[in-house]
């Protein structure tokens, strides 16, 4: 053994060839600060070996290196910029020394090589991969950019265009694509990986492969003519501006850094990467996006822990076809759980099957599946007008009309047709689960399962625990949601549950602004362009359906009369009474026409202003700050109440439900992350300016306490040890 660290070791393989093996004590290899230091020590040992002829890098895990240790980021990024820069210089000196070894090097890459894992293998001369490879640089999705030389080596290896596509978008690619663009030199079966890598290494040692020529471009300026550079970087900057926008500084910073570094050799280019990385690491956007990553891990880990002792349902059923039922059936079948889809109406069944077929055909058009796979999936969806096959199902989700009487009748009838251990769930969006459970003989086998539309796109599923729902019932439904590729979050029961309960105060803020003379077009523009929502409230209401919102608004008002009962006729009432239901009938806040692709395109409609004039004061202008405050305060207050009342368990779950269920702007990180960034005292000052608008603007006592003691909702993160104290040699 040449060297043994906590997460890697170095040993001789055969005559003059050494292997450096990543083998962390945990289930995966991560490139944390300790591993970077160990790598430096191992390379120091290699540099002393006069008889060294070649080096093989490999992993003892199912994945090579999954990336840096993201849990370290929040504390590491709190150290002063100068110290962070110093540590990055050290880390890059380690990879430079790996790259500068006087012998050929190869990485045998299996599974994931992401972020720092990808940057590590970019420093070797050759890369051989297995078919399960996923390799790339996802840093911009975390609000940062590659910091271990990825923005320097990748463009010089692949050319600017391919590298920019991966780095700016935070992409990873599979084995075939990696081979095609030159990110790896070959792909072999897993059992042949080491044998194949050794064969390449021997060829390089023997002089059959010119490893020095392979290494040289990574040390030099990027080989691009002035015209090529102008085209590549102009197109990349345009694409980034269009897709990322102003709220995500990392992608455009990465592109500009690669452009600026193009004319320099490795050392100066790495200095430019360092200078760009450090300020990004200190942005609120990076903290928010890293927070989302960590929250996502927490939520998925919680679901995994919850379901460890239950069997995932093998056969499911959906009650109620149509668009929603068809979407649920598709998602279940697509992920391998056959489903019976029942409706009392043949036309609805046809609509549900058409929806599932349409979604599968889209996968076919994109080349994700072939005709055989399509036929196989669709054959596992069984439409029926009766209860045939229900005696075999493990779980049933009801997705009929949002009417408590209808839902109770359907659920009670279904309970008589299934096994005693079959779990029933309702896809209601607002009706309390405990109320629906009153119709059942086995309420312990019942819970809520709230999908979001469109089902195939929206990651969140709210799992609602009723008063009598058993732990096993919740676990089984969480297991099914996870199997469907969704992110399940368990919430406690109340009208609207979590997501709709906090959404309708937001809509109430919108209605009050309109009542007071604001223009809905400006509100939408501000909430989209300035705050960052994917849709403004008017557009969102049109997509949800004015009729749906009108009904849900009444349910929420009955559930929370003190705050949500309004004493005036609002814009939603006015549009509903005029039969303007949104996109579904082409008339809402906008007039909708289909474009050439059959998608609804919104157009101005003067009739709306006349309708709104009946329920509004004369038009007046509101500042962007006032619009944002009046829209967000009711929502954030309600989010805080949900945490205080135990409707949602943690700030992390609340923020993920908002991001995944409503599209809360990820660069804000969710309501609690936004609150922490703003500061609870500053938020309280802002909210008090609007408390005259009514109970929705009254700040909950728990939040007032936070403001008094200057306490955040997320545990405060301590800065990493001074970088000088980290192992840097």
UniProtKB/Swiss-Prot annotation:
Q: Which annotated residues bind substrate?
A: 296, 500, 660
Kindly identify the residues recorded as the active site: 450
Q: List, in alphabetical order, the GO biological process terms annotated in this UniProt record.
A: fatty acid beta-oxidation
The record's annotation in InterPro entries points to: 3-OHacyl-CoA_DH_CS, 3-OHacyl-CoA_DH_NAD-bd, 3HC_DH_C, 6-PGluconate_DH-like_C_sf, ClpP/crotonase-like_dom_sf, Enoyl-CoA_hyd/isom_CS, Enoyl-CoA_hydra/iso, FA_oxidation_alpha_subunit
Enzyme Commission numbers on file: 4.2.1.17, 5.1.2.3, 5.3.3.8, 1.1.1.35
Which residues does NAD(+) bind? 324, 343, 400-402, 407, 429, 453
What's in the GO CC field? fatty acid beta-oxidation multienzyme complex
Residue span of region Enoyl-CoA hydratase/isomerase: 1-189
**What Pfam families does this protein map onto?**
3HCDH, 3HCDH_N, ECH_1
Q: Which UniProt keywords apply?
A: Fatty acid metabolism, Isomerase, Lipid degradation, Lipid metabolism, Lyase, Multifunctional enzyme, NAD, Oxidoreductase
Q: Name one GO molecular function term.
A: NAD+ binding
Q: Could you tell me the superkingdom of the organism this chain comes from?
A: Bacteria
Is NAD given among the entry's keywords? yes
Q: Where are the stretches annotated Disordered? A: 708-729
Protein role: Involved in the aerobic and anaerobic degradation of long-chain fatty acids via beta-oxidation cycle. Catalyzes the formation of 3-oxoacyl-CoA from enoyl-CoA via L-3-hydroxyacyl-CoA. It can also use D-3-hydroxyacyl-CoA and cis-3-enoyl-CoA as substrate.
Give the NCBIfam families listed for this entry.
FadB, PRK11730.1
Protein name stated in the entry: Fatty acid oxidation complex subunit alpha
Per the UniProt record, the lineage of the source organism begins with: Bacteria, Pseudomonadati, Pseudomonadota, Gammaproteobacteria, Enterobacterales
Q: Which gene encodes it?
A: fadB
């Amino acid at each position: 053994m040449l060297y043994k660290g906590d997460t890697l070791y170095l040993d001789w393989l055969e005559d003059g060839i050494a292997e450096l093996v990543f083998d962390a004590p945990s289930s995966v290899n991560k490139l944390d600060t300790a591993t970077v230091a160990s790598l430096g020590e191992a390379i120091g040992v290699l540099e002393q070996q006069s008889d060294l002829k070649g080096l093989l890098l490999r992993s003892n895990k199912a994945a090579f290196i999954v990336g840096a240790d993201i849990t370290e980021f929040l504390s590491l990024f709190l150290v002063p910029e100068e110290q962070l820069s110093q540590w990055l210089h050290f880390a890059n000196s380690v990879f430079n020394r790996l790259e500068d070894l006087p012998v050929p090097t190869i990485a045998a890459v299996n599974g994931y090589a992401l972020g720092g894992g990808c940057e590590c293998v970019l420093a070797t001369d050759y890369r051989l991969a297995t078919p399960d490879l996923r390799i790339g640089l996802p840093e911009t999705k975390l609000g940062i950019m590659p910091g271990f030389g990825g923005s320097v080596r990748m463009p010089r290896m692949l050319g600017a265009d391919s590298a920019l596509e991966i780095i700016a978008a935070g992409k990873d690619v599979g084995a075939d694509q990696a081979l095609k663009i030159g990110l790896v030199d070959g792909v072999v079966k897993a059992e042949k990986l080491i044998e194949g890598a050794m064969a390449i290494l021997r060829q390089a040692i023997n002089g059959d492969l010119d490893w020095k020529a392979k290494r040289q471009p990574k040390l030099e300026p990027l080989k691009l003519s002035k015209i090529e550079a102008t085209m590549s970087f102009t197109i990349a900057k345009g694409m980034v501006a269009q897709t990322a926008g102003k709220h995500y500084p990392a992608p455009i910073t990465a592109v500009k850094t690669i452009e600026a570094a193009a004319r320099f050799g490795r050392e100066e280019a790495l200095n430019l990467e360092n200078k760009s990385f450090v300020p990004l690491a200190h942005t609120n956007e990076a903290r928010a996006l890293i927070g989302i990553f960590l929250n996502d891990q927490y939520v998925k880990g919680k679901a995994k822990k919850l379901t460890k002792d239950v069997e995932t349902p093998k056969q499911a059923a959906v009650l109620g076809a149509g668009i929603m039922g068809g979407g649920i059936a598709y998602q279940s079948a697509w992920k391998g759980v056959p489903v019976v889809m029942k409706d009392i109406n043949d036309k609805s069944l046809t609509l549900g099957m058409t929806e599932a077929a349409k979604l599968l055909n889209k996968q076919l058009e994109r080349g994700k599946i072939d005709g055989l796979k399509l036929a196989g999936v669709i054959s596992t969806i069984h439409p029926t007008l009766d209860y045939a096959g229900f005696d075999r199902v493990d779980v049933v989700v009801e997705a009929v009309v949002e009417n408590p009487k209808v839902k109770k009748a359907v659920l009670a009838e279904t309970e008589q047709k299934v096994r005693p251990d079959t779990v029933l769930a309702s896809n209601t969006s607002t009706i309390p689960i405990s109320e629906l459970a009153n119709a059942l003989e086995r309420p312990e086998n019942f819970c809520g399962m709230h999908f979001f539309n469109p089902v195939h796109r929206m990651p969140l599923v709210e799992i609602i625990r009723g008063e009598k729902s058993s732990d096993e019932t919740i676990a089984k439904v969480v297991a099914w949601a996870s199997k469907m590729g969704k992110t399940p979050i368990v919430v406690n029961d109340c009208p609207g549950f979590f997501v709709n309960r906090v959404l309708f105060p937001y809509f109430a803020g919108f209605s009050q602004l309109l009542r007071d003379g604001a223009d809905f077009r400006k509100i939408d523009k501000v909430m989209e362009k300035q705050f960052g929502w994917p849709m403004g409230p008017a557009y969102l209401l049109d997509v949800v359906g004015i009729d749906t919102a009108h009904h849900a608004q009444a349910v929420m008002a009955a559930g929370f009369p003190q705050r949500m009962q309004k004493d005036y006729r609002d814009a939603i009432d006015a549009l509903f009474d005029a039969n303007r239901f949104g996109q579904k009938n082409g008339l809402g806040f906008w007039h909708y026409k289909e474009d050439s692709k059959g998608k609804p395109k919104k157009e101005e409609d003067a009739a709306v202003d006349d309708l709104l004039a009946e329920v509004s004061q004369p038009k007046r202008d509101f500042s962007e700050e006032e619009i944002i405050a009046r829209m967000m305060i009711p929502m954030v207050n309600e989010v805080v109440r949900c945490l205080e009342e135990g409707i949602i368990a943690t700030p992390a779950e609340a923020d993920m439900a908002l991001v995944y269920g409503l599209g809360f702007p990820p660069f804000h990180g969710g309501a609690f992350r936004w609150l922490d960034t703003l500061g609870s005292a500053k938020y309280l000052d802002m909210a008090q300016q609007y408390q005259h608008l009514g109970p929705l603007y009254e700040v909950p006592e728990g939040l007032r306490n936070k403001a008094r003691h200057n306490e955040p909702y997320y545990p405060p993160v301590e800065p990493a040890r001074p970088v000088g104290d980290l192992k840097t040699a």
